[in-house]
Amino acid sequence: MNSIQENEHVTVFREFLKIRTDHPTPDYESSTKFLVEKAKEYNIPYEVYRETGTPIVLMKIEGLEPNLKTVLLNSHVDVVPAVHDSWKVDPFSAWKDESGNIFGRGTQDMKCVCMQFLEVARRIVQSGQKLKRTLHLSFVPDEEIGGSGKGMEKFVYTEKFRQLNIGLCLDEGLASPTNDFTVFYGERAPWWVHITAVGNAGHGSRFIEGTAIEKLMRTINKMLAFRQEQFESLHHGQHECGKKLGDVTSLNLTVLKAGIPIDHSNNFSYNVIPTQAEAGFDIRIPPTVNLDQFLDQIKEWTAEEGLSFKFASYIPKNEMTKLDSDNKWWENFKESCKKMDINLVTEIFPAATDSRFIRNLGIPAFGFSPINNTPILLHDHNEFLNEKVYLRGIDIFMGIIPNLVNME
Ligand SMILES: [Zn+2]
Ligand SMILES: [Zn+2]
């Protein structure tokens, strides 16, 4: 396509897509350099915060009443890896087809929102108009690697973060395949449970009682029965009360380990009953479930003698943002969308985002990516976003963010 005719904001977006912030070796220095250059060009005050170990780019537009609670626009700059062979184009070339679909890793998750937030900040600064509250932007690393990251999870516990004095955070949502837009007000808690069973050994030709595998199987079966219940309530819900994935607890057996290997080969001793067997589960729990009670449930499942469990991922707290008339941020957000004839659907995010760290501090957070009429392709091959949808997203944010920042 002839790039001369391209909208300048689309060009900036495509430049940002080309920066290799994909794991496992994200180039954060290049993304930081890009953001800093843009901040300078747009006259947005900025700083690069490095205390958590990787650079976080912060931008700030001071309000008329800087003591009021502020608004934070948070976005992560890292992206998940892309399997080149499964893509029809180079996932880091930001290739655009004739209809304006831009293909690239991060087009939906979430380099689009990074650049839309940046453009909103530029327009506010350029307008010369002072807003009531202070507006902060944070561009963080390591969202995609969860617990081991040096991004938001660590940043929220710093003095720097506390000083931002945040009243509301906007962060990523998901694309919507329909004409509606989705807003997320909570997430499911990711719990990864590792269960170990120990039991009696013996020769494979005998009826040995109380073996590790037997005990583990009993527990696995109980947990898979629970999985089936949840699956059915989701399936049932699609016809009855509109239950979505974010409303139920999902549970998958993702690790299974037993058997006595012969030396260090791939062969096993088929005639030896192993004394130990292990299983791992990926469990995602909606914020409507009491986590203490669910922990008791896991203890009950693993109560049999010889069984024990530990967490590979565990969060004890999973706050959600209340969407009622007491939440003035939500009323303001809704009102802005209504004025633009935008139909909002509210949901629990089926996976995890940085919003959970914010909500667990008691700060409300909305997950919202202004992408509609687009298939959900985050983390998928051939992830794309149409340039018109991207540009409309900037206008949508312009219809929402200044109102939030000007809120009484
Ligand atoms: Zn994301
Ligand atoms: Zn992601």
From Swiss-Prot:
Q: How is the cofactor bound?
A: Binds 2 Zn(2+) ions per subunit.
What is its subcellular localisation?
Answer: Cytoplasm
Q: Which cofactor does it need?
A: Zn(2+)
Q: Name one Pfam family in it.
A: Peptidase_M20
Q: Name the active site residues.
A: D78, E143
Q: Which reaction does it catalyse?
A: an N-acyl-L-amino acid + H2O = an L-alpha-amino acid + a carboxylate; an N-acetyl-L-cysteine-S-conjugate + H2O = an S-substituted L-cysteine + acetate
**CC per GO annotation:** cytoplasm
Leading EC class: hydrolase
Binding residues annotated for Zn(2+) 1, in chain numbering: H76, D109, E172
Q: For this protein, what is the EC number?
A: 3.5.1.14
Q: Which family does it belong to?
A: Belongs to the peptidase M20A family.
Instruction: Outline what the protein does.
Output: Involved in the hydrolysis of N-acylated or N-acetylated amino acids (except L-aspartate).
Summarize subunit and interaction data from the UniProt record for this chain: Homodimer.
Which NCBIfam families does the UniProt record give?
Ac-peptdase-euk
Q: What is this protein called?
A: Aminoacylase-1
Taxonomic lineage of the native organism: Eukaryota, Amoebozoa, Evosea, Eumycetozoa, Dictyostelia
